From Swiss-Prot:
PANTHER family: LEUCINE-RESPONSIVE REGULATORY PROTEIN, TRANSCRIPTIONAL REGULATOR AZLB
Keywords, ordered alphabetically: DNA-binding, Transcription, Transcription regulation
DNA-binding annotation, residue ranges on this chain: 21-40
Organism ancestry: Archaea, Methanobacteriati, Methanobacteriota, Thermococci, Thermococcales
CC terms in the record's Gene Ontology section: cytosol
Name of a matching Pfam family: AsnC_trans_reg
Protein name (record): Uncharacterized HTH-type transcriptional regulator PYRAB04820
Transmembrane segments: none
Example GO biological process: response to amino acid
Taxonomic source organism: Pyrococcus abyssi (strain GE5 / Orsay)
HTH asnC-type domain: residues covered: 2-63
GO molecular function: sequence-specific DNA binding
Length: 147
């Protein structure tokens, strides 16, 4: 279970994962060794799974975001999810309830790129149908959830 200090450390790292232990310690008024030990413990327990950066995907050529619902044969769902998850354009693969069995969020350079992806998904054994939504405007896209 996370205590208040762990939550504060995580909150700071979520805003800037490059911040030094010394800066975190100063901000929270604790010893640098405490910060080091807490972060190490959070990594070892799997709470922190790595340090990354936040990209502006449009600035690197991925101008199109799509959300795809996939209806699949029950016994093939896991295999389909694994195949789709390997594609570098795929941001998220969710096993869900409702009309569709799988929801995929992916980024593409253009409509042709998306079209090839959709056709590729439709060719996977066990995929019955897809429903693809093109995102017109990203209002919020932030997968960071502070504890």
């Amino acid at each position: 279970m996370l205590d208040e200090l762990d939550k504060k450390i995580i909150g700071i790292l979520m805003k800037d994962s490059r911040i030094s232990y010394r800066e975190i310690a100063k901000e929270l008024n604790v010893a640098v060794g405490t910060i080091y030990n807490r972060i190490k413990k959070l990594e070892e327990s799997g709470v922190i799974q790595g340090f990354t950066l936040k990209l502006n995907y449009e600035n690197i050529g991925y101008d199109l975001t799509a959300i795809m619902g996939i209806k699949a044969q029950g016994k093939k769902i896991r295999e389909i999810e694994r195949i789709i998850a390997k594609d570098k354009r795929v941001m998220c693969v969710y096993d869900v309830t409702g009309e569709y069995d799988i929801i995929v969020i992916a980024k593409f350079k253009n409509r042709e790129d998306m079209n090839r992806f959709v056709k590729g998904v439709l060719s996977i054994d066990g995929v019955e149908k897809t429903n693809t939504h093109v995102v017109l405007e990203v209002v919020k896209e932030d997968f960071r959830l502070e504890p």
